[in-house]
Amino acid sequence: VKALEEDGKICGYANLRVIAGEGEVERIAVHPDFRGRGFGRKLMEQMVSSGRMQGVTDMTLEVRAGNETAIKLYASCGFQKEAVRRGYYREPVEDAVIMWNRGI
């Protein structure tokens, strides 16, 4: 787990799981008060760097289909949409977009 702090406050965190040489960004979150200031990008850069240090060459993540801000961030970090899990999320029901960055 990687956390980012500013002025002693945790402003975001992310977690990477590595299995069989592949990395999965399991969680990434930025506190609403800190959004739009590049913390999400910093966390993604840390996840990719951490993955590389662990020998990962491919990374994946899933995101709510309606979270266009996150999808744009992930795409700018080299992730591409590869699949959709229909009705994956509950409350509200929403599809999950599966994204991969192959060859990090």
What residues fall within each predicted segment?
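Alpha-helical macromolecular-interaction surfaces
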Residues: G38, K42, Q46, E68-K72
